[in-house]
A protein has these predicted regions:
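Carbohydrate-interacting/catalytic domains
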Residues: 33-36, 60, 65-66, 70, ...
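Aromatic-lined glycan-binding groove of carbohydrate-active enzymes
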Residues: 28-70
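Substrate-binding cleft/loops of secretory-pathway carbohydrate-active enzymes
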Residues: 1-33, 42-48, 110-113
Length: 282
């Protein structure tokens, strides 16, 4: 994708085969042993801006004995298997680079793709497949809605690691940024461990509201979310001056947006004032 005047070929995009190979190798590993392959998850950002990349999971990866995406997930428990795939797709969609996902993988088709037959649409009658399909629909809508997820794909200003060294926990966290400076805080966990009161550094002091969580019940998760706005405190973490405590879903992704003043907090404060005023009158 380099400019022809600079010796490049001048294509609009290039498939990121390095990311694809590392990512699929990482995802195929047992979650309990992924910490030994943590570098495969983070290495792609070292060369992410050397080309205009597309993150690609093509038909080549779901044929000829390579297994469909859902069957690349190593878990035997079906709930965990689909949770893992939701985390994988969430990471893919929040990682810099355009996206290519082959048909059928968006609803978790169990069989490999075969060019002589149609997709197994009947699998959408299964609850797990149907909820993954809904998840992908919402993930695509989020991607389309949030410029931070695509505007600066090929500019280093659009991405910033918060933590890319938590190998033991197998958690990565980072910021995606839009041209106007709007930021999204992304946290992804690749182990089946629910982590409550998990401390994470934030780009700046303020209030952080969760806008997306793969652990929602409508997607097949347990419903353990970050329903309340997290207010940062001046406590150093991840080489950041300010931090928040969150619930990190097992095999999942959660995304936060910094908000100026949450409506729920405003209502709660107004309610407290009213109660105090009534007590004073009495």
């Amino acid at each position: 994708s380099g400019d022809e005047n600079d010796g490049g070929l001048g294509f609009d995009f290039k498939w990121n085969m390095g990311w694809m190979n590392d990512f699929l190798d990482f995802m195929s590993a047992d979650p309990l042993f992924r910490k030994g392959r943590y570098g495969e998850l983070t290495f792609s950002m070292i060369y992410a801006y050397s080309e205009d990349f597309i993150l690609v999971i093509s038909h080549d990866e779901v044929v000829h004995g390579k297994a469909s995406m859902i069957n690349k997930m190593p878990e035997t428990d079906l709930d965990e298997k689909f949770s893992d795939l939701r985390a994988a797709y969430g990471f893919m969609y929040t990682h810099p680079g355009k996206k290519l996902l082959f048909m059928g993988q968006d609803f978790g088709q169990f069989n490999e793709w075969w060019e002589e037959k149609s997709l197994d649409w009947d699998e959408l009658s299964n609850e797990h497949n149907r909820m993954l399909h809904r998840y992908m629909k919402d993930l695509n809508a989020l991607y389309k809605k949030e410029p931070a997820l695509y505007e600066l794909d090929y500019n280093p200003d659009g991405f910033e690691w918060i933590n890319n060294i938590s190998a033991d926990e197998c958690i990565v966290s980072y910021v995606r940024r839009a041209k106007n400076g709007d930021e999204l805080l992304v946290v992804v966990s690749f182990t089946p461990v629910l982590r409550e009161k998990y401390k994470i550094g934030v780009p700046s002091a303020g209030q952080y509201k969760e806008i997306f969580n793969s652990n929602a019940k409508k997607y097949g998760g347990t419903g353990k979310l970050n329903s309340r706005v997290r207010v940062s405190e001046e406590s150093e973490c991840d080489n950041r001056r300010n931090s928040i405590h969150i619930t990190v879903p097992p095999l999942g992704i959660c995304i936060f947006r910094k908000v100026e003043q949450d409506e729920d907090i405003e209502k709660a404060e107004e309610s407290k004032k009213n109660v105090t005023a009534k007590k004073s009158k009495k």
